[in-house]
Curated annotation (Swiss-Prot):
Residues bearing the modification Phosphotyrosine: Y196
Gene of this entry: RAPSN
GO MF entry, a single one: protein-membrane adaptor activity
Organism annotation: Tetronarce californica
Modified residues (Phosphoserine): S405
Protein's name in the database: 43 kDa receptor-associated protein of the synapse
Cellular component, GO, one term: cytoplasm
């Protein structure tokens, strides 16, 4: 298969994919990879396969194609294509919740040589690295990466990247319970889709709507949350986007749980958990399990609650997510308090505070915790987070966290 035929087949596959003929598109791209003698064409076909398998939630296959793409890039001796392939490797590891590996590949990308095209990749690399750090509950590092990605998006006038970064920032602030910002950023993403996204994939609209739904739910605006989530789910079903379907089912279940309808919540949690397990999203599984545990807790079924929390803890520990571990310890406290097991209760109180220390989830001005209740946060240029009200009363005195870390102990 020569250069012209390779190009024609790739374009044919893209047209089929956009028309939701996914199976036919995958078959064509696979044939290009197997039969084409032209390395740039094979590289591009592998890129199409990577994107398609990512959107379907087939992350193991995505990673396999990313490895093949990196080998093709090395054969071509093209540093920019090597960077692109390494970015896809990073994304694959991130999707499989192998966050440290994802960070390592991102750092390799940022340290690689290349021309103007590599600079365009840097924004996407920073976004992937931020998502990986968020998966590890390294909030300051995640925010630093997201802000860098946003600067690249603005500098390159890359509205698609800006849209994706805004969604990640929405997820970031949902976790830290600044629900005003958690809603602001996906709303900004939705505005970008409305203003610039006429020719974009519908996944951008679906993604922004899902993150809006998550924020609305946290704000107690259940009707708005349901409406946004239904819109997102409709697109996810239409495009066979299994990862987004799992997230929407989780959101639907959370809405029903908030409305005290455990009978409707549990089947949706189970459906979400099945998809999360199928696609290999271990962190997603842990999130679902914690919320199932809350249902059993409401029903006063402590043995069931305990079993589910233990599974969530194991998954969170395996992927290195400290925030989910903290939430698990919090649930353990409630369970053991109900059971009257004082020693086990004390053990988990200690572990809870250890997680807080590890994540540095304290305001450096007032000393109170960050992320335990809905409150407005503000980041300084160094990406350290504080309560907004504390910064407003502190004045322009610089970052107390940075000042503390720069003071070195003297010799005694």
């Amino acid at each position: 298969m020569g250069q012209d035929q390779t190009k024609q087949q790739i374009e044919k596959g893209l047209q089929l994919y956009q028309a939701n003929e996914t199976g036919k598109a995958l078959e064509i791209w696979q044939q290009v990879v197997e039969r084409s003698t032209e390395l740039p064409g094979r590289f591009r076909a592998l890129g199409c396969l990577i994107t398609a398998h990512s959107e379907m939630g087939k992350y193991e296959d995505m990673l396999r194609f990313a490895v093949a793409q990196s080998e093709a890039a090395r054969q071509m001796g093209d540093p920019e294509r090597v960077t692109e392939a390494y970015l896809n490797l990073a994304r694959g590891h991130e999707k499989l919740c192998e966050f440290s590996e994802a960070v390592a590949y991102c750092r390799t990308c940022l340290g690689a040589e290349g021309g103007p095209l590599r600079l365009q990749f840097n924004g996407q690399v920073c976004l992937s690295m931020g998502n990986a750090f968020l998966g590890l509950s390294a909030f300051q590092k995640a925010l630093e990466c997201f802000e860098k990605a946003l600067r690249y998006a603005h500098g390159n006038d890359d509205k698609m990247l800006e849209c994706r970064v805004c969604c990640s920032l929405g997820a970031f602030y949902v976790q830290l319970k600044d629900y005003e910002k958690a809603l602001f950023f996906p709303c900004k993403s939705a505005e970008l889709v409305a203003d610039y996204g006429r020719g974009w994939s519908l996944k951008y609209k679906a993604m922004s709507r899902y993150h809006m739904a998550a924020a609305y739910r946290k704000l107690g605006r259940m009707d708005d949350a349901m409406e946004c989530c239904e819109e997102s789910m409709k697109i996810a079903l239409q495009h066979q986007d299994r990862p987004l379907q799992a997230l929407c089912l989780l959101c639907f279940a959370d809405i029903h749980r908030h409305r005290s309808d455990i009978g409707k919540a549990l089947p949706r949690y189970e459906s979400s958990l099945n998809i999360m397990t199928e696609i290999g999203n271990r962190l997603g599984q842990a999130h679902v399990l914690l919320n199932i545990a809350k249902c059993w807790m409401t029903e006063k079924k402590l043995d069931k609650t305990l079993g589910v929390v233990q599974k969530a803890e194991e998954l969170a520990d395996a992927v290195g997510n400290k925030l989910v571990l903290l939430k698990a310890h919090c649930l353990y406290e409630t369970i053991y308090r109900e059971m009257g097991s004082d020693q086990l209760l004390r053990d988990h109180v200690v572990k809870f505070h250890e997680c807080m220390e590890d994540m540095e989830l304290y305001c450096g001005l007032c000393g109170e915790s960050i992320g335990d209740q809905n409150s407005q946060l503000q980041a300084l240029p160094c990406s350290h987070l504080f309560h907004l009200k504390c910064l407003q009363t502190n004045g322009n005195r610089g970052c107390p966290n940075c000042k503390r870390s720069s003071v070195k102990p003297g010799y005694v």
